[in-house]
Regions:
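Short, exposed beta-strand "edge-strand" segments with a Pro/Gly-rich flavor and a Y/T-containing core
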Residues: 64-70, 219-226
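Residue-level recognition of well-ordered secondary-structure positions
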Residues: 21, 38, 80-83, 125, ...
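Glycine-centered flexibility motif
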Residues: 49, 97-106, 191-198
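Catalytic core of non-heme Fe(II) oxygenases with the double-stranded beta-helix
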Residues: 115-125, 129-225, 233-236, 241-244
Length: 244
């Protein structure tokens, strides 16, 4: 399945529309379903002016969910401990090509045995279940083929002023989520520090087409969940505070 979607992505990168069309039909007939296919198909729809239906998630921008994780689910003390851990662990950060003026923790946070990590994991699992139940009759592949067993992976990203994440999607994931521990208050009420979504894959040709950008406002304690096929980036910000 992943090899086939990789091949589909290569055909899109090479702008071989006829071959792409044939491969898409073959994968659609097989009901191949992964986030890589989802991202590829939505980009292709724009540049080829087609209406391919994504077997993973069609019109994935409609499946962005933002909600607060309140203190009942994740205490203020645990949140502060998580921020402290992020500041202490900076010596173990890994390089991240998509990240400008920021740092990312290495490894999977959920492999750590701290009470505040267990607490945020439990809160996230509750929100993930709520997300799944929000779209019961959507007919979308990623809901209908929801994995019976899944593993959560998490890392922390801290950005300083001017920092941002470049556009990407998570082609090996199922759903993607961001939980915001600290979002600075910005002087001007613009889109600084917000998250932006698009069907434009940065590795694929755009053929001069216009890709709509959808920007969602995020605040401290918000969780934003969306299909892993959806390309996203963040808007640079200007603040003396870190964005975590």
């Amino acid at each position: 399945n992943s090899c086939q979607s990789l091949y589909l992505g290569c055909l899109l990168s090479l702008n071989r529309e006829k071959d792409f069309n044939e491969k898409y039909k073959e994968l659609a007939d097989k009901k191949a379903c992964n986030s890589d296919i989802g991202g590829i198909v939505e980009h292709a729809n724009i540049i080829y002016g087609k209406k391919y239906t994504s077997t993973f998630c069609h019109e994935s921008i409609n499946y962005v969910f933002i909600e607060k994780i309140n203190e009942e689910l994740f205490s203020e003390n645990d949140l502060k401990e998580l921020i402290s851990y992020s500041k202490m662990s900076k010596k173990e950060d890994r390089s991240q090509g998509l990240l400008e003026n920021g740092i990312q923790t290495s490894g999977n946070l959920f492999s750590l045995d701290y009470p505040f990590i267990k607490s945020i994991q439990k809160a996230l699992e509750i929100k993930i279940e709520k997300y799944k139940k929000k779209f019961p009759n959507s007919g979308q592949g990623f809901i209908n083929n929801w994995p019976k067993n899944y593993e959560l992976s998490a890392w922390m990203i801290s950005m300083k002023t001017g920092g941002f994440l470049k556009s990407h999607n998570h082609e090996y994931g199922w759903i993607t989520g961001s939980f915001y521990l600290q979002i600075p208050k910005y002087k001007n009420n613009d889109d600084s520090g917000n998250i932006a979504f698009s069907y434009q894959g940065p590795r694929y040709p755009n053929k001069g087409k216009n890709f709509n950008l959808t920007i969602k406002k995020i605040e401290t304690r918000d969780i934003c969940i969306f299909p892993s096929s959806l390309f996203h980036h963040t808007i640079p910000f200007n603040s003396s505070e870190e964005r975590i």
